[in-house]
Amino acid sequence: YDEGMRAIALDSTHDGAYHLIGAWHAEVMRLSGFQKFFAKTLFGGGFLDKGNWDDAQKYLARAIALKPQNIFHRLELGEVYVDLGKYSKAREQFTAIEPLPLADVLDHTYKQEAKQILDDIKGEKDET
């Protein structure tokens, strides 16, 4: 977390740093109560209290604004939207992935994941 924030402070246009921070927030929020308890016991865990869904969305959206062709940025934000029951917004991200060119060795896999999740949430209505 600290390194990602430091990277943003040094270069406010570093899309990867914004992705890192947004993904960190999402992963902290996805931890179970037991996992959070274990992490707090083992590592002190004060840093876990920083995690929140709003920042996950904000930082990942900023990564996309900086590099809209990045498939992984869109996949990660779409997954956050699914976690939050914002299926319409998730569909927007997953649908936007399909026409994007492959630029990373994992982009083909990311496209497949997006297509699978899009199929999984077919017919889901927004919860919020």
Q: What is each of the regions a protein language model found here?
A:
Residues A63, I71-H73, G78:
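Extended serine/threonine-enriched, polar tracts that run as long, contiguous segments within proteins
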Residues V28-K36, K86, I117-T128:
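Alpha-helical linker/edge segments of TPR/alpha-solenoid repeat scaffolds
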